[in-house]
């Protein structure tokens, strides 16, 4: 990027569509759910239910070593089943979305973004959705996008990334 003189790039992900499930009793599902290019009245698409991360080799946030620890991560919890600290998950301890803040604003427990609480390392994340049930032979469609933008400094690139994401969301919708 230095030879292109476009600044520090930013990358982001957006969860466009989750699996299709039946609507709950009394829930307005007049819009219906999307699946494989078809609208399904009386159904809904699940939204992302949690976002968790782990760090390869970190003593606190290390990789899951069995299915129970992996399942905790899929629920937006740490591998031992405890909640993430509020520096990561925000002031609401029921928050299941790590780093949901706006990186263009100051980091705080009201705006958690990936700060300097642990050194740089092999970081991984999970965009989770559920629960839902699938029988053998069932099909589901989950759609997400991965975006890249570069526009000046790091924060300018994040602002541009948000514009790119908004355009992609509009195109998908």
Feature-to-residue mapping (PLM):
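Extracellular/surface-associated beta-sandwich interaction domains
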Residues: 1-173
């Amino acid at each position: 990027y230095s030879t292109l003189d476009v600044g520090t790039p930013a990358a982001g992900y957006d969860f466009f569509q989750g699996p299709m499930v039946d609507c709950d009793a009394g829930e307005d599902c007049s819009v219906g759910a999307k699946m494989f290019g078809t609208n399904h009245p009386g159904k809904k698409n699940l939204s992302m239910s949690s976002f968790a991360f782990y760090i390869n080799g970190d003593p606190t946030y290390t990789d899951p070593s069995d299915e129970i620890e992996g399942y905790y991560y899929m629920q937006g919890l740490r591998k031992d089943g405890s909640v993430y600290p509020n520096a990561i998950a925000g002031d609401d301890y029921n928050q299941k979305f790590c780093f949901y803040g706006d990186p263009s604003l100051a980091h705080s427990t009201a705006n958690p973004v990936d700060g300097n609480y642990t050194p740089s390392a092999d970081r991984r994340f999970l965009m989770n959705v559920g629960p839902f049930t699938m029988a053998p032979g069932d099909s589901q469609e989950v759609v997400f996008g991965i975006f890249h933008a570069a526009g000046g400094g790091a924060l300018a690139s994040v602002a541009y990334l948000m514009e790119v994401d908004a355009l992609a969301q509009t195109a998908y919708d």
